[in-house]
Amino acid sequence: MLADIWPSDQSIQEAVSSSIGPEMFRDRYSDILEEPKWDSIPSEPSPLFPWDEDSSYVRLPTFLEGILLNPVPIDPINSARALLKLGDSVTTDHISPAGAFPKDGPAGKYLIEKGVNIRDFNSFGSRRGNHEVMMRGTFANVRIRNQLAPGTEGGFTTFLPTGEVTSIYDASRKYIADGTDLIVLAGSQYGTGSSRDWAAKGTLLLGVKAVIATSFERIHRSKLIGMGVLPLQFTDGENKQTLRLDGSEIVSIKGLDTVSYTHLRAHETAC
């Protein structure tokens, strides 16, 4: 029987104590900083990371600017327009794809303008350190279907003030230039899939103030909160269809001055 040969916890602990000691780790890591290949990498002696404005891989993201020790009050959302109207089961990969991207999309055009050869585009996953690339890829998965731009595939929407069908990124820039708040309308199980930070970061950088859905995946909901995007849920029995929302509405969300970040953390929903 296995129980006859299986060692006791005491025997295992005695074996570990007699064979493993702190000197093993001290010896192994004593010269960890003495690596010629690592030392040969050019660097500047500084306690802060020297951001390179010419880098196409690592850039200082705008959401790190102006961070305060204490959270600021939640801004009101007035006269917002919908950037997307989505169905059920929108995954984090729909929101922030990790694969390759085309040369004629917003991300590809950005890199070409920066002098990057098409063969060196790599993927969204490899360029997660560049917010300029990642926000241009948000909601750009070819499998996403935005009901505000019927008949299109991928990252397109209708710029509602003019009716122009354009990329989600370009539309977001126009809304931001006009000072228009943005929301996303969604169905159930919004944000399922892998835990992907950029699904929340990219949403914020597009100017989205709130995502209004039937239900949220718990982890993605918490990441939206962490980035300052409000995850708002329809009341039980209500959704886009029952309220007859077609996405063209102008939306104002009242009472946000009474909401604190503790309220947002206290209520968790699962799909």
Predicted feature locations:
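Active-site-proximal loop->helix
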Residues: R218-P231
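Conserved small/polar residues in nucleotide/adenosyl-binding loops
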Residues: T262-T269
